[in-house]
Amino acid sequence: MTGLTLDTGALIALERGNRVVAAVLQRAIAANADVALPTTVIAQAMRDPAKQVALNVLMRTSATDIVDLDQPNAVAVGRMLAVSGTSDITDAHVAVTATSRNHTIATNDPGDLAALAPNCKLIQV
């Protein structure tokens, strides 16, 4: 695995103690793989920072790269949405991030992401 990009469902599952997500993250970190968290995913998952310990720890881990929806990413997301005929900015941000880095995607909704990032491996959590 060259790296791992997490979607919102994976972060929520992590917060709920999902062992599959925890194991996937542990394997990625042990392999010195990059872990990417798109900011749109963080925005969807973050509700109470004081109580979301697992998410806060993950965001502070040195292996984690927080991926902003900056101008180049925003343009790539918009293009992906236009081509796919879909409208979920967060899913497209995950797909753009993973595709550009050749990452595996951890998701609880593989259908949407498989359509957006057909060349990325998906791990259902």
Model-predicted regions and their roles:
Residues 1-37, 46-64, 123:
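Short, well-structured N-terminal submotif of metal-dependent ribonuclease cores
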Residues 10, 47, 91-96, 115:
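Hydrophobic side chains within alpha-helical segments
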Residues 31-32, 61-62, 83, 101, ...:
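Structured helix-beta-strand junction loops
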Residues 44, 54, 76, 115-116:
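Phosphate- and divalent-cation-binding pockets in alpha/beta enzyme and binding domains
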Residues 65-110, 123:
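Active-site neighborhoods of divalent-metal-dependent phosphate/nucleic-acid chemistry enzymes
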Residues 111-119:
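Short loop/helix-cap segments at secondary-structure boundaries that form the rim of catalytic
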Residues 119, 124-125:
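Beta-alpha-beta core module
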